[in-house]
A protein has these predicted regions:
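Multi-pass alpha-helical membrane architecture of UbiA-family
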Residues: 1-167
Length: 167
């Protein structure tokens, strides 16, 4: 798990929420509590992605990063898999709750997609230079786009849609 990268995600989402969305939108859909759950879900899924990546990279890391590897050195693969599932399930419970609160349950599918994509990347896409890098770039962008979806879209009704889009 890369704590600095996780902190960057938190900072970017907080900056977008409090310095952009809350200033531009009269009333956003996410309360501070639901925003906390949203950010925590994003961080937990990202941390889970790091764990599954380390699990699949264990053999390569034995050679390339023997001193810094964690799986089967500091943490067994079995325990790492437990944490992978625990983090992702916890994140999904949180984001499903937030999706229900904002009455957009289908938004939670984006987080299911992110979990699947991180697993797919770790399993076999990271060896494909272009596809792997494009997927990771897309998932990073999606972590920012998601905030707009969850915080702005639920507050836009059909009458105000054209005003919001073209302002």
């Amino acid at each position: 798990i890369r704590p600095v990268n996780l902190l960057i995600i938190v900072l970017i989402q907080c900056l977008i929420k409090y310095l952009l969305i809350n200033i531009l939108i009269d009333q956003s859909a996410l309360s501070n509590f639901n925003f906390l759950l949203f950010v925590t879900s994003t961080v937990l899924i990202t941390a889970g992605g790091y764990i599954i990546n380390d699990i699949y990279d264990e053999d390569v890391d034995k050679i390339n990063k023997n001193k810094s590897r964690i799986i089967n050195k500091k943490l067994s693969a079995r325990i790492a898999i437990f944490w992978y599932f625990f983090l992702n399930i916890t994140a999904l419970i949180m984001i499903i709750y937030v999706s229900l609160v904002i009455k957009k349950i289908y938004f939670s599918l984006i987080f299911f997609y992110s979990i699947f994509s991180l697993w797919k990347y770790s399993k076999n896409l990271k060896t494909s230079f272009l596809r792997g890098n494009l997927l990771v770039s897309w998932l990073i962008a999606l972590s920012i786009i998601n905030l707009g979806l969850f915080d702005i879209i639920p507050k836009i009704d059909n009458n105000n849609l054209s005003k919001t889009v073209f302002i």
